[in-house]
Amino acid sequence: KHFGKDSNFPFGT
């Protein structure tokens, strides 16, 4: 899933 920005977060993949 995409959260926040892209790789800006640990779960933003």
Swiss-Prot record:
Tissue: Expressed by the venom gland.
Entry annotated with the keyword Lipoprotein: no
Subcellular location: Secreted
Chief localization: secreted
Superkingdom of origin: Eukaryota
UniProt keywords, alphabetically: Amidation, Antibiotic, Antimicrobial, Secreted
Entry GO CC: extracellular region
GO biological process terms, semicolon-separated: defense response to bacterium
Phenylalanine amide modification, residue list: 11
The keyword Secreted is assigned to this record: yes
The protein's role, per its UniProt record: May be an antibacterial peptide.
Family the UniProt entry places it in: Belongs to the non-disulfide-bridged peptide (NDBP) superfamily. Short antimicrobial peptide (group 4) family.
Record's protein name: Venom peptide 1
Naturally occurring in which organism (per UniProt): Tityus serrulatus
